Structures are given as structure tokens and as C-alpha cells.
């Protein structure tokens, strides 16, 4: 049981990992050995050769965007457009109650959702031995780089809050494939606030003005260290909860 929990989610993680590390059949190079996520987090690995390095040790060309990242980027941009149209149609329906906007919103939802499924299927295809461009190194590069990015942000957020509170504690309650859950109770206690509406507004402002810019900065630090093609990790505040209960892994 935890009071005042805030979650942060990475946006479309696997598609963005493919774009960030330039993961594609024609960009893959020979990899480095004896690489672990812990060694990468502590920056024990030499990454000065200029090639993009994924967390499993696989290396990629970074002088030109690969075929797969290019396709992913195109589909992602299209999904963003249709998702925006969906939200606009939903707002118009809420304002006018005109059924044509309801139908339009549903249409755009289906289009953007199909593109979301298509984007996420890229990882599954790469990891399928019957796929023409199957390569277990590519699939592993995606999953392990995802682990690296989550564990990296766990470490950096703990550093941030320990510095803020002058402590040596662990403020990450839990993490998932693309998200982290932070214990904000000490911050709420510091403010002395008791009104829940005011607390939520204050936490929202703090996350937007302090935490999200910090996350962007430390993800750029990791991207520079790994020589990525493009820094694509975007993490935004998702949930603000006055209480959170964890009964088991992935059960909360």
C-alpha cells in the first residue's frame, strides 16, 4: 500500500526503440561482447567508436536511416494525424451531440488503432523465425534496449528525488516494460497540503515543470552515450493516484 503515487509512461516504446537505435536488416553490424545492462548504466562500456549500440551489444550504422525505422516513422506520423482527428471529432460530438461526429470519431479510432497494431507488430515479425527478415539479434536488441531505458530512468529518478529530499532511499515503487511508479508521499508531506484537489494540481505542475524536463535531459544523456540515430524516448506523466496497492507483479 502506498499513498500518492505518480506514474510515467514511455510513448510507443518498441516502435521508438526501432527508430532510436536504427534497427533494420541492412544497418546491423558486428556486435560487442560481454555487455550487460548494469555495465551500460554505469557507463563501463567504451562507446566511442561512433556506431549506434543496442543494449544486447548489437551495433548499427548511424550514418543513414534504415528501411524499418523509416517505415515505422511514416506509420507513426500517420497514426498521430488520425489520433488527433479522432480527438477533434470526439470533442465536436461532445459539444454538438451531432451523430456524424460520433461516427467520424469511431472511423478515426479504427484507423489509428489499426496503425498502432501495425507498429507494434514490427517487433513480433522480427522475432518470428518464419519472417523473411527474422534475426534474433534484432528482437533481442529491442527488448534489452527497452530494459536499459527503464532501468536507466529508475536510477536517475532515484538520484533526483534523493537529492531533492537529501536521502538515500528508493522512490520507485514499481516498474513495467514502459512505465515507472514513483512514491510522491514525501513531497506531499513536505508541502503540508491536505486538500486532495490542490495536491493533484500541485503534483501535476511539479511533474510537468520539473520531472518531465529532467527525464528528457537524462534520456538525452543515455542517447548520446549509446550513439543512437535519434533520441526517441519520450516519457510523460500518466496517473496521479492518492493510493496505490500492489498485490503481486503486474497486479496493482
Predicted features along the sequence, with ranges:
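Conserved acidic
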Residues: 1-252
Amino acid at each position: 500500500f502506498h499513498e500518492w503515487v505518480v506514474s510515467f509512461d514511455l510513448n510507443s516504446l518498441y516502435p521508438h526503440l526501432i527508430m532510436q537505435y536504427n534497427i533494420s536488416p541492412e544497418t546491423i553490424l558486428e556486435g560487442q561482447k560481454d555487455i550487460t545492462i548494469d555495465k551500460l548504466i554505469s557507463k563501463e562500456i567504451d562507446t566511442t567508436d561512433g556506431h549506434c549500440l543496442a543494449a544486447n551489444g548489437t551495433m548499427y550504422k548511424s550514418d543513414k536511416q534504415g528501411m524499418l525505422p523509416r517505415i515505422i516513422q511514416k506509420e507513426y506520423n500517420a497514426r498521430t494525424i488520425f489520433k488527433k482527428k479522432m480527438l477533434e471529432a470526439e470533442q465536436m460530438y461532445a459539444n454538438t451531440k451531432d451523430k456524424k461526429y460520433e461516427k467520424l470519431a469511431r472511423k478515426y479510432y479504427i484507423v489509428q488503432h489499426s496503425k498502432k497494431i501495425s507498429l507494434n507488430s514490427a517487433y513480433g515479425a522480427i522475432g518470428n523465425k518464419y519472417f523473411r527478415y527474422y534475426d534474433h539479434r534484432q528482437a533481442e536488441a529491442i527488448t534489452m534496449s527497452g530494459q536499459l531505458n527503464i532501468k536507466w530512468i529508475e536510477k536517475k529518478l532515484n538520484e533526483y528525488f534523493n537529492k531533492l529530499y537529501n536521502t538515500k532511499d528508493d522512490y520507485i515503487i514499481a516498474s513495467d516494460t514502459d512505465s515507472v511508479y514513483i512514491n510522491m508521499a514525501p513531497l506531499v508531506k513536505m508541502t503540508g497540503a491536505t486538500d486532495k484537489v490542490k495536491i493533484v494540481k500541485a503534483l501535476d505542475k511539479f511533474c510537468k515543470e520539473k520531472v518531465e524536463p529532467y527525464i528528457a535531459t537524462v534520456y538525452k544523456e543515455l542517447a548520446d552515450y549509446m550513439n543512437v540515430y535519434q533520441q526517441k524516448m519520450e516519457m510523460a506523466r500518466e496517473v496521479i493516484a492518492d493510493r496505490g496497492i500492489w498485490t503481486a507483479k503486474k497486479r496493482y
